[in-house]
From Swiss-Prot:
GO molecular function: DNA binding; zinc ion binding
Record's keyword annotation contains Nuclease: no
PANTHER family, alphabetized: PR DOMAIN ZINC FINGER PROTEIN, ZINC FINGER PROTEIN 833-RELATED
Organism: Homo sapiens
SUPFAM superfamilies with a match to the protein in the record: beta-beta-alpha zinc fingers
Pfam families recorded: zf-C2H2
Protein name: Zinc finger protein 107
Keywords: DNA-binding, Isopeptide bond, Metal-binding, Nucleus, Repeat, Transcription, Transcription regulation, Ubl conjugation, Zinc, Zinc-finger
Function statement: May be involved in transcriptional regulation.
């Protein structure tokens, strides 16, 4: 018995295709359902020419449905493509997609849709009706299908499996996207620039680059986005909510994609492999970066200057710089920007708004990326490890920057002076040296900075905020980086090693400074006198000698300094706090440099040797001063009397002769001194402390300098020779005193009678005649 043949519904909007095409097109689809029917048994009848002729259709939606249900089969054809539908509504919907007609418009935002169901779904964005709630985590959704997909996160269910490689996915769309990897097919081509994409959605996103359209706005912060997914991500960042937790280590993430990437660290999974070199990666973006290394990575070329970029967005930004197009203006200060995102970030400077708050410590940030970085301080997780040296980092970007130390790669070059950098951010900072731009101003003291981070750190001076505390000794710091460096004092860690001599340092800048010792290179020249320095910082300090500028003032007693480090040292002297303890004999010091110097004295180590005479020193600074004896160089000149000195400390001591200032007072006896070191030495008279002992004869001294002088008695060493008469001395100060005999110079003058002396000690003794002071008492009572 032959089955009853299918009959076409009388109600359809399209004309039937020619009869000769039935066998080729229609039969294939229809016979899936009616397999037993022969081609000749299919009876097709032509009904109304247009849907408007159908009385059932005019009767309303329900009448049409009844009519369609009554027919044995409901098959409708699309004119553009041979496609078969079992519902009249599906045929109409499909036709609208080809024509591009969008009759259904949203009253809220004017967005149009070609299908009513799409408009209905879209409306829920405005109404925020989240009817479907997840029982596992409480998260609500406005579509049931989204809830179903979400549940798979908790269950781990992945029903969609790739037949090619066996990889499974929790959504069919992910499987479809994945399959394209195997085919390498890129059917979706951009008509504007010719770039091809594997997915149509990627092409849609790409097109926005050309149009610049950003239809998705976040009402909370006013930020606009080109993609709805970016808006969703932004909302999550504002809430700070971390819903996705790693079962392996307990770390939580605000995005599921971040959790997926994180899991690969534990599993060691690296699914993204480079075909060029075979290197594998756990994140697709890292593979993209690697591929660009092989290709030269700069596919987007500027037609104006031939400069190439590895990202089209960078090319767009570059073009605006050439055109000097800056359409986004700040209404507050009038500054213009070539990107809207840059303007948005800039506005926060004026408002002081910090919407991103850390739940752990309450600290707030003006950018979500800063909050993300800050959170890692609390977790202390360092997932990214350097294969070269084993050092671990909490951010992948930090690891990439760290690797450049070994490769020596510096891809970012300054067009102004040619200097190259390994980070684009460092180049951006460097450029401000040429422009002199300092857009970040302190409201407290009007001081301006070229970087916002510098302003943030500066503000802590006014507030006194020190959020980073050392668990070892309790000392607090206003910067996390300073705390990290401080911790190395306790651990003794010295990660920066010199390849030339093997010497290790606890800070990178110390290693950089040290390397210059081997090269003997002096690139930084003083324009005033032509003197050259190995370090630019030394040249900067040297310049202050010529200008006499002292911008750093101590509020305690008004003393001014030419270096911030000197002011810091001064403050510590005022507090009298001794944080650094020498474990060998328990002595404490107020400065880390003092304990370091003390250790060298204790061990007797003298690593810095003079090539001229072979004399060795425990400090490099002492060697530098010593070398001036051979060269006769005296760069520090007194503005008052013109006398020159070979070290700044001697000049500072000399200046006090003219001012008569004695700011350092002994609490025990009230005696005042012009130098803090003299006060320290004086205090030992009261305590009787003599920590510096001679190994030769056992004699003890209250000052290390006295011990050094004493040792020369045993060695009979007299390295300081008078050029006038040939007499030798064991101390440089003794040679200076001796020289006065030849010059007849008497720089120390009595203010009472005008009598002059060649030694300050003689002037001090003379003054006691006027004051009647007799500080030295005989045990038997006579003074």
């Amino acid at each position: 018995m032959v089955a009853k043949p299918p009959v076409m519904s009388f109600h359809f909007a399209q004309d039937l295709w020619p009869e000769q095409n039935i066998k080729d097109s229609f039969q294939k689809v229809t016979l899936r359902r009616y397999g037993k029917c022969e081609y000749e048994n299919l009876q097709l009848r032509k009904g109304c020419k247009h849907v408007d002729e159908c009385t059932g259709h005019k009767g309303g939606h329900n009448t049409v449905n009844q009519c369609l249900t009554a027919t044995p089969s409901k098959i409708f054809q699309c004119n553009k493509y041979v496609k078969v539908f079992d519902k009249f509504s599906n045929s109409n919907r499909y036709k609208r997609r080809h024509t591009g007609n969008k009759h259904f418009k949203c009253k809220e935002c004017s967005k149009s849709f070609c299908v009513l169901s799409q408009l209905t779904q879209h409306r829920r964005i405005h109404t925020r009706v989240n009817s479907y709630k997840c029982e596992e985590c409480g998260k609500a959704f406005n579509w049931f299908s989204t809830l179903t997909k979400h549940k798979r996160i908790h269950t781990g269910e992945k029903p969609y499996k790739c037949e090619e490689c066996g990889k499974a996915f929790n959504q069919s769309s992910q499987l479809t996207r994945h399959k394209i990897i195997h085919t390498e097919e890129k059917p979706n081509k951009c008509e504007e620039c010719g770039k091809a994409f594997k997915q149509a959605s990627h092409l849609t996103i790409h097109k926005i680059i050309h149009t610049g359209e950003k239809p998705y706005k976040y009402e909370e912060c006013g930020k606009v986005f080109s993609q709805s997914s970016h808006l969703t991500t932004q909302k999550i960042l504002h809430t700070g909510e971390n819903l996705y937790k790693c079962k392996e280590c307990g770390k939580a993430f605000n995005l599921f994609s971040n959790l997926t990437n994180h899991k690969r660290i534990h599993a060691g999974e690296k699914p993204y492999k480079c075909k060029e070199c075979g290197r594998a990666f756990n994140i697709s973006s890292n593979l993209n970066k690697q591929e660009k290394i092989h290709t030269g990575g700069k596919l987007n070329k500027c037609e104006e200057c031939d400069k190439a970029f590895n990202r089209s967005l960078k090319l767009t930004a570059h073009k605006k710089i050439l055109m000097e197009e800056k359409p986004y203006k700040c209404e507050e200060c009038g500054k213009v920007f070539n990107q809207f995102s840059t303007l948005t970030r800039h506005k926060i400077i004026h408002t002081g708004e910090k919407p991103y708050k850390c739940k752990e410590c309450g600290k707030a940030f003006n950018q979500s990326s800063n909050l993300t970085e800050h959170k890692k301080i609390h977790t202390a997780e360092k997932s990214y490890k350097c294969e070269e040296c084993g050092k671990a980092f909490n951010q992948h970007s930090n690891l990439i920057n760290h690797r450049k130390i070994y490769s020596g790669e510096k891809p970012y070059k300054c067009e102004e002076c040619g200097k190259a950098f390994n980070r684009s951010s460092t180049l951006t900072r460097h450029k401000k040296i040429h422009t002199g731009e300092k857009p970040y101003k302190c409201e407290e003291c009007d001081r301006a900075f070229s970087q916002s981070s510098n302003l943030t750190e500066h503000k802590k001076i006014h507030t006194g905020e020190k959020p980073y505390k050392c668990e070892e000794c309790g000392k607090a710091f206003n910067r996390f980086s300073t705390l990290t460096k401080h911790k190395r004092i306790h651990t003794g860690e010295k990660p920066y090693k010199c390849e030339e001599c093997g010497k290790a340092f606890n800070q990178s800048y110390q290693l950089t400074r040290h390397k210059i010792v081997h090269t003997k290179e002096k690139l930084n020249k003083c324009e005033e006198f032509g003197k050259a320095f190995k370090q630019s910082s030394h040249r900067t300090i040297h310049k202050i000698i010529h200008t006499g500028e002292k911008p750093y003032k101590c509020e305690e007693h008004g003393k001014v300094f030419n270096q911030s480090s000197n002011l810091t040292t001064q403050k510590i002297i005022h507090t009298g706090e001794n944080l650094y303890k020498f474990e060998e004999h328990g002595k404490a010091f107020n400065l880390f440099s003092n304990i370091t110097n003390h250790k060298i004295i204790y061990t007797g180590e003298k690593p810095h040797k003079c090539e001229e005479c072979g004399k060795a020193y425990n400090r490099f600074s002492n060697l530098t001063i010593h070398k001036r004896i051979h060269t006769g160089e005296k760069p520090y000149q007194c503005a008052e009397c013109g006398k020159a000195f070979n070290c700044s400390s001697t000049l500072n001591r000399h200046k006090i002769i003219h001012t008569g200032e004695k700011p350092y007072k002994c609490k025990e006896c009230g005696k005042a001194f012009n130098l803090s070191s003299t006060l320290t030495a004086h205090k030992k008279i009261h305590t009787g402390e003599k920590p510096y002992k001679c190994e030769e004869c056992g004699k003890a001294f209250n000052q290390s300098s006295n011990l050094t002088t004493h040792k020369k008695i045993h060695t009979s060493e007299k390295p300081y020779k008078c050029e006038e008469c040939g007499k030798s001395f064991n101390q440089f100060s003794s040679l200076n005193i001796h020289k006065i005999i030849h010059t007849g110079e008497k720089p120390y003058k009595c203010g009472d009678y005008g009598r002059a002396f060649n030694l300050s000690s003689n002037l001090t003794t003379h003054k006691k005649i006027h004051t009647g002071e007799k500080p030295y008492k005989c045990e038997y009572g006579k003074t």
